[in-house]
Design a protein with these regions (language model features):
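Glycine-rich beta-strand-turn "strand-cap" elements at beta-sheet edges
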Residues: 1-4, 9-10, 38-49, 75-107
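Short, surface-exposed ligand-recognition loops at beta-strand->loop->(often short) alpha-helix junctions
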Residues: 10-21
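An amphipathic, aromatic/His-enriched active-site/gating alpha helix that lines ligand/cofactor pockets
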Residues: 25-37, 56-91
Length: 107
């Protein structure tokens, strides 16, 4: 079962570039971890300045193991000093009824 993590945040004023760099370092690190299917650094399409990461894992266990690695903990600690309150970390699983064919199809 695919396990998905979504992290969103808004950098503090003047810390946008550093926040982007730390997020990219996390993405690069997670891509090397066992069970990582796909990992992406994202920025909001509007002018909100929000950014984050979306990662797909082979299992919740794989995601948790990567998140508790020393490098991940260090980088995530740095992020907390760079972003506004309200940083969100969410986890999802792919719904059983979801199929690849349904993605992007017209409703």
């Amino acid at each position: 079962m695919t396990y998905i993590r979504v992290s969103t945040m808004t950098p503090l004023a003047g810390r946008e570039e550093e926040t982007s760099q730390v997020n990219q370092e996390l993405v690069d690190f997670y891509r090397t971890q066992e069970g990582c299917v796909s990992n992406h650094f994202v920025k909001a399409a509007d002018n909100s300045g929000e950014q984050g990461r979306i990662s797909f894992w082979s299992s919740e266990r794989a995601a948790n193991e990567a998140a508790t690695q020393e490098r991940s903990l260090q980088l995530r600690s740095r992020l907390h000093l760079l972003v506004r309150r309200g940083h969100q970390d969410r986890s999802f699983t792919v719904a059983a009824a979801t199929t690849d064919a349904a993605v992007g199809s017209a409703v």
